[in-house]
Amino acid sequence: MKEQGRSRVSEDGIIILFTAVLYLGAGVWLAGQDIVHPDAMSRVADGYFAVFSRDPHLTASDFLRGPLPSLAVIPLLLFAPMVPVLAAKSFAGVVVSAFCGVLAMVLARRLLVLFGMGGGAALVLTGILAVHPLILLPAASGASESMLLAVALYATLNLTRWLREDDPWRLVHVGTGLGLAYLVCHEAVAAVAATVVLVLVVSWWRSRGGARAGSLFLLDCSLAGGPFVAAFALWALASRMATGSWFAAGASWHGDAAQAAGARAAVDEVTGGNLDGALTYLSAQLLAVAPLAILFIAVALVIATWRRDAGVLGPAAVLGGILALEEWAFLSGWSFGWLRLQLMAVPWGMLMAGYVLGTLRAGVGRLAFRRATAWVVLIATLVPLPVAWWATTDPRLAREEQQAVEVARSGQYATQAQVAAYLDSLDLPEGSVITDTTYSFPIVLASRRPRQFVITPDRDFREKLDDPITGRVRYALVTDPQRSPADAIAARFPGIHENGAGVANLERQWVDGRGVAWRLYAFATP
């Protein structure tokens, strides 16, 4: 047992060292190129506003997404005044996502070993998984998918162990992982549903005929689903208290569903605007990033059925549940269909490849045949990597990634930093510049004087927007309406970006390489 413990720590240490250097190094390079994940930066902004705005409060989140990624960066953001890059380049998010990426790979290695792989082979397969673009890029860019993957694999590992060991303590860990997953990303609700159904069926099967069969499988379901219920209820209550809506993501114009509906024309350009086209598009994405995942999953399920091993259902419930909801959301028009949303197919397929390899390792029959088959499977996990990296450069399949590159080339963040520097140079008092941080959050993050802004999360934002002069607001900062269709300032003063709407005069303008203009208007005093 001691030897196994030392071996496990050593192998985990190799994964930790390799992935930490890889993800942090890639993160530094991406930040240096101004290739910033917009969702990652907005989550850092939520955490930043909770600490450094003129009205700091933990409910500064927009309540449109899970709060955990924003809360996780707050300890790092406390050092932002001394290390501005933590906020200005959202590098605090990169540190957190890199940590989560490292944790995810450690958990993936342990799952591969649990599925029967040897230590060295598990290291190799984990290394292949770690350099996959859908794993590496979120971990190096601050994207929340890295945190979601870590907690999903944590739940998967413990669910797989429970399916094999029937230890109720494992279900406590499963429930904890799923509850955390919901607080990262609401799509985790599908994993919760699939897991609870799986636990219900398996627990009932195990306890059938017993005197306390009913109470036992209900207890197991409570352990697996209870933390999610608590997280769901508490977050809904917090949303109600802060925004007046139980589910702000569905009610707000800034929610993903509303934004996806608004951008449907752009999505229809690549799908043809029909179900067949959408299915073809999703299939192309899936085949590009995980072309053999379906094959590995199918083979593993056949082997598991033959061996009567329910362990493979753990990844199917958690990873497969999240993936299924992502696909359904896109087909229903509630999602942008970003390439990164295919993420869960990658580890699911890799884990099932590991299961096949583990079966070959422990199997019977000619050793030469089993070794040859194992090499074929191992090579099959490696060969698709170049195709997956190519997919991230395809403007049709990887629309979000290409937008990030175009933004960097256009100098958008450099232009926004110029806006922040100019406002800082004015030495304005608190609350002098009103802006909708749904769109201007990079400017606030780049500023060394964040309290000069009146921002959307401020509890007196609406009051100051209704009467800027009385509220001692001197300027309004707005951008192109085509890129800010739900801007609160433009809604209050229609036409302000074009001509000041009769209430303000143009003070200054900044234009980036794509022609996107930021305009600073000074409110006219009576």
Predicted regions, residues:
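Membrane-interface transmembrane helices that cradle and orient dolichyl/undecaprenyl
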Residues: L114-G116, A155-H173, A181, W205
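Membrane-lumen/periplasm interface segments of multi-pass, membrane-embedded glycan/lipid transferases
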Residues: F52-L58, F217-L218, A236, R240-A304
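Hydrophobic, aromatic-rich transmembrane alpha-helices
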Residues: R109, L200, R206, T280-L313, ...
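Membrane-embedded, lumen/periplasm-facing catalytic core of multi-pass transferases
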Residues: I379-Y439
